[in-house]
């Protein structure tokens, strides 16, 4: 049986996410960038909207699993910090994945069912995991668009990097969102 200390220990990690800025925005010179917790909230909200979007189109989606995955998706960064994409590539994506899996397993040791959900997200093989992975990347593009509207420059690489559009082709209709974002940027 879990104890109060188990909950409190996990919450120590969650609270760290409020203090860590998303490193990619710092790398690109964005003034006052969002925290990892800010990002996680936006991803969770977008994932909730995407669940409704896909349900409207006849998909069966387990909303609770999507929401839990969305809330959990960055928990490993409470131990590792947020690694900017170029740093991830330099260190090796597979290596980062192994280390992050270990960190999440340790953080959620008293909550193995949540650790299992995080691993499902990381594997990206279920509709629920894909919705969260896509929400994660769409949120990145939306945040970049918001920063551009507020005067940030030099964010073109974020929009053009294929890693930031990973998994988009695995679910239908996602290009509609990308087209809407590009249109808002003034792209054709």
Residues of each region from the PLM?
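Alpha-helical, largely C-terminal catalytic domains
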Residues: 1-188
């Amino acid at each position: 049986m879990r104890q109060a200390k188990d909950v409190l220990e996990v919450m120590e990690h969650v609270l760290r996410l409020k203090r860590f800025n998303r490193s990619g925005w710092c790398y690109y010179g964005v003034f006052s960038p969002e925290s990892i917790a800010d990002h996680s909230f936006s991803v969770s909200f977008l994932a909730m909207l995407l669940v409704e979007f896909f349900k409207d189109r006849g998909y069966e989606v387990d909303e609770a699993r999507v929401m839990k995955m969305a809330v959990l998706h960055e928990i490993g960064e409470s131990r590792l910090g947020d690694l900017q994409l170029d740093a991830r590539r330099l260190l090796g994506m597979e290596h980062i994945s192994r280390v992050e899996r270990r960190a999440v397993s340790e953080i959620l040791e008293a909550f193995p069912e949540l650790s299992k959900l995080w691993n499902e997200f990381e594997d990206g093989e279920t509709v629920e995991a894909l919705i969260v992975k896509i929400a994660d990347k769409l949120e990145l593009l939306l945040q970049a668009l918001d920063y551009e509207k507020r005067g940030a420059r030099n964010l073109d690489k974020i929009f053009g990097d294929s890693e930031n559009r990973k998994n988009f082709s695995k679910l239908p209709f996602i290009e509609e969102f990308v087209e809407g974002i590009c249109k808002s940027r003034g792209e054709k």
